[in-house]
């Protein structure tokens, strides 16, 4: 059964995308669809360009060829003011959390509201408390970032990401560096916020278990190509050796354990003085 996402149902559509850094081809003519109201995951090993894809979707980088549309708008043809308006509708949870260290939890969440709206402080207070309540940290509003655990900081960053009620959120490695309890809390939050707020979520991750638990659809990327795509169940049953190696964490396979080198015995017996 083919469960591929129809472009008609997509909030974000990536068509025939190619992108390089220097001589390294990051994406080679790939196409992806991100369905409205769903959680879509981009998976693959480190260095495959997952975070780069988020930057391309956000208009921070320009593709060599292809197009990216968000809510029907071609991201890379927008004027600066139009791109600015679009970005206000796109929440972002950075891998680092990126909290402003000299601001309290409350002021971190209030920051986008103060920057991008003309709401009175009384309404901003109400909205901030609502967002903090949603992530379970309303009682931490007066703490400073250096008083937070890693999991708490990630949840505060999520509250800030939804402050402007975006249509979508992009998550850059949300589970990295988190303990099992924090991972479980983030899994619950991402799924529940997506459902309750009607969000479209894009998750970049190499954490297989957590991501598969909440994703509606998964793309697996390697060496610039999509090597697997489908529902978590379809990915689990994929006959691709590469997908199976990634999902099971096997040490060797299509992604080799050894970095390319000349023959081992020849290398040992070589009389060359160069390493």
Where are these regions (language model features)?
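Catalytic Walker B motif of ABC-type/P-loop ATPase nucleotide-binding domains
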Residues: 169-172
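Helix-to-loop junction immediately C-terminal to a conserved catalytic motif
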Residues: 58
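Conserved ABC ATPase signature
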Residues: 144-148, 152
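A short, proline-enriched helix->beta-strand linker immediately N-terminal to the Walker B motif
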Residues: 163-167
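ABC ATPase nucleotide-binding domains
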Residues: 248-275
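Conserved ABC ATPase "signature" region
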Residues: 73-74, 121-139
């Amino acid at each position: 059964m083919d469960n591929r996402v129809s472009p008609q149902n997509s909030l974000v559509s990536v068509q025939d995308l190619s992108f390089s850094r220097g001589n390294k081809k990051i994406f080679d003519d790939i196409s992806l669809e991100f369905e409205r109201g769903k959680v879509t995951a981009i998976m693959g090993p480190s260095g495959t360009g997952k975070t780069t894809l988020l930057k391309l979707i956000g208009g921070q980088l320009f593709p060599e060829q292809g197009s990216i549309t968000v809510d029907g708008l071609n991201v890379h043809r927008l004027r600066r003011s139009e791109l600015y308006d679009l970005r206000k509708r796109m929440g972002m949870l950075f891998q680092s959390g990126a909290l402003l260290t000299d601001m309290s939890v409350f002021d971190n969440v209030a920051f986008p509201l103060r920057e991008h709206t003309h709401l009175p402080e009384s309404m901003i207070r109400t909205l901030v408390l609502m967002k903090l309540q949603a992530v379970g940290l309303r009682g931490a509003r007066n703490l400073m970032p250096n008083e937070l655990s890693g999991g708490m900081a990630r949840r505060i960053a999520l509250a800030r990401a939804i402050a402007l009620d975006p249509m979508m959120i992009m998550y850059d490695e949300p589970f990295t560096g988190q303990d099992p309890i924090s991972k479980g809390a983030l899994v619950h939050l991402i799924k529940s916020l997506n459902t309750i707020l009607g969000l479209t979520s894009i998750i970049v991750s190499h954490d297989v278990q957590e991501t598969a638990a909440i994703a509606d659809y998964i793309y697996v990327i390697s060496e610039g190509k999509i090597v697997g795509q489908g529902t978590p169940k379809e990915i689990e049953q994929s006959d691709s050796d590469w997908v199976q190696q990634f999902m099971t964490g096997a040490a060797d396979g299509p992604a080799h354990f050894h970095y390319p080198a000349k023959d081992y015995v020849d290398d040992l017996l070589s009389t060359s003085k160069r390493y």
